[in-house]
């Protein structure tokens, strides 16, 4: 697919609406939204609220996930392929199984040697995000503004950053750009925390996930579609695992060059896709959200990132034309930071696993290239406002404001610092 066609596909994807009352309604309208964190980035879905009179944008701070990628780990491709190949060699595949094996081989071949790498669409996603930044907030990126960009050490993140920066330079060659990817900055860019990580492996989390998975298991019919001998399947196939890997593979195609050419969605009914999504969605919430099953503290994994955002903003506010601070990393940073800030209510505790799907929607929080933008405005009296964009749409915060979705910087900062004070290891 050439660059012109890629850009056309991306622009169409960005134009697609996402608002619906329930996940089932969303998935019925667009089946690819059932793909959890594999959902290809859609871009903004709403118009921005005009700034209060007299306020102009002057600084932008950002943290974004890399764009669409290939799946991570050889098993993601090898387990489905070799499971189906073994069945074929032993005469145990149905006609649907033969068809699926051919598709899986094509998908595996495309990904060969590209473990977790950025796809061409992933690159386009970051070009589009940067282009819209500059179009929506031209004052920030005017003239020889300074752009400070950092990435984690993972190549898909570095390439996401480079695609964004190249787009900036195409639109304004006068920009002064500093960019880096160093272990020096990982304490906030990709913070590790042994204590919080240990809670993710707690017995409580494991039990709730296993119980939920048993309750929502939905692989029997899929196995019957693929294989002609149920006794052989029981003896040779981990049915739950194969179903899950095929669901993930089906979800991942939308971010690759095979989208529109190959699909595995015909393996699943709408209800089966929903049941698989429920399990993925729960996994994200209990691992990175405000969940009693992981101590109600996982969002604090991003305490250093939030402090970096605050401190850099404070220093940039003192400058006449500070430009932008850009950070490129992972879903495992954007998601807990979204919860730490309690954007759109995603920081609320959810105790009942069966209620998670009515309050938490991973495809709206954690798609490929998901990003948070903190856009700063000021007036001639130097009063500073900030608004937060999640996936380029205005987000709400539990902060009183007379100009919502804009918030007074001092109120926002006080809210964040009070949050951080509340964390005790």
Tell me what each language-model feature is.
Residues 1-23:
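Bacterial Sec-dependent N-terminal signal peptides
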Residues 21-148, 152-325, 329-425:
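Signature for phosphate-centric chemistry
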């Amino acid at each position: 697919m050439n660059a012109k066609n890629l850009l056309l596909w991306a622009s169409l994807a960005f134009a697609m609406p996402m608002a619906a009352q329930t996940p089932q309604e969303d998935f019925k309208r667009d089946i690819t939204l059932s793909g959890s964190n594999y959902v290809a980035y859609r871009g903004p879905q709403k118009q921005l609220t005009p700034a209060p009179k007299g306020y102009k944008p002057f600084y932008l701070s950002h943290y974004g996930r890399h764009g669409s990628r290939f799946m991570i780990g050889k098993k993601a491709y090898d387990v489905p392929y070799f499971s189906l190949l073994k069945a074929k060699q032993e005469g145990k595949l149905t006609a649907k199984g033969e068809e699926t094996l051919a598709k899986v081989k094509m998908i595996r071949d495309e990904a060969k040697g590209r473990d977790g790498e950025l796809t061409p669409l992933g690159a386009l996603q970051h070009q589009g995000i940067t282009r819209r930044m500059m179009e929506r907030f031209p004052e920030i990126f005017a003239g020889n503004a300074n752009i400070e960009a950092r990435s984690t050490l993972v190549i898909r993140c570095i390439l996401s950053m480079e695609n964004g920066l190249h787009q900036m330079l195409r639109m304004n060659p006068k920009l002064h750009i500093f960019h880096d990817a160093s272990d020096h900055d990982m304490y906030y860019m990709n913070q590790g925390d042994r204590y919080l990580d240990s809670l993710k492996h707690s017995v409580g989390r494991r039990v709730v996930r296993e119980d939920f998975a048993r309750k929502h298991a939905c692989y029997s019919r899929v196995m019957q579609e693929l294989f002609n001998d149920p006794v052989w399947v029981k003896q040779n196939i981990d049915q739950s695992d194969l179903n899950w890997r095929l669901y993930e593979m089906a979800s991942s195609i939308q971010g690759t060059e095979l989208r529109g050419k190959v699909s595995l969605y015909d393996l699943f009914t709408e209800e089966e896709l929903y049941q698989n999504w429920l399990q993925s969605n729960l996994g994200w919430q209990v691992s990175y959200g405000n969940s009693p099953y992981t101590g109600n503290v996982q969002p604090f994994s991003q305490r250093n990132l939030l402090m970096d955002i605050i401190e850099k903003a404070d220093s940039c506010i003192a400058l006449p034309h500070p430009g932008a601070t850009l950070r490129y990393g992972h879903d495992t940073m954007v998601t807990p930071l979204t919860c730490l800030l309690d954007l759109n209510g995603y920081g609320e505790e959810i105790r009942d696993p069966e209620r998670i799907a009515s309050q938490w929607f991973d495809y709206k929080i954690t798609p490929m290239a998901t990003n948070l933008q903190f856009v700063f405005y000021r007036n001639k009296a130097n009063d500073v406002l900030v608004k937060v964009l999640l996936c380029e749409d205005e987000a709400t915060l539990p902060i009183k404001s007379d100009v919502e979705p804009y918030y007074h910087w001092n109120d926002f900062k006080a809210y964040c610092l009070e949050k951080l004070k509340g964390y005790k290891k």
